[in-house]
Amino acid sequence: MVSLWVEGTFPPPGFGLAHVACSGHGMKQKRKPASSEPTPEDALGGSAVPVRFHLHPEGLLWCSRCFFSHGPKGSEPPGRSAGLQGATERSGRPSVQAQAQACENLVPATVWDG
């Protein structure tokens, strides 16, 4: 399976594991009146702001803020394997998989199931 970007969209129900933006990322929750039609935002807790997600081959999901939050060069986040570091050194820039695996805020999608 290939990595891909989905901007302004939300994952289908029951999609593997998920990292979703939460209040720690400064996102605010907004509930719609009960009379309005359910939206993809409602499925993820009523977030009023579209969020960019990175879909990863292992069936994991990251928010764009964590995906791109990396410290200065030389300060590797925990969880990187030597194999991923080797691939990074050969290419001269971090791979998509290496950056995604550096995200420490994974939340099981079952938390969001109704």
Curated annotation (Swiss-Prot):
Organism of provenance: Homo sapiens
Region (Disordered): 26-45, 72-98
Top-level taxon of origin: Eukaryota
Protein name stated in the entry: Uncharacterized protein FAM215A
Lineage: Eukaryota, Metazoa, Chordata, Craniata, Vertebrata
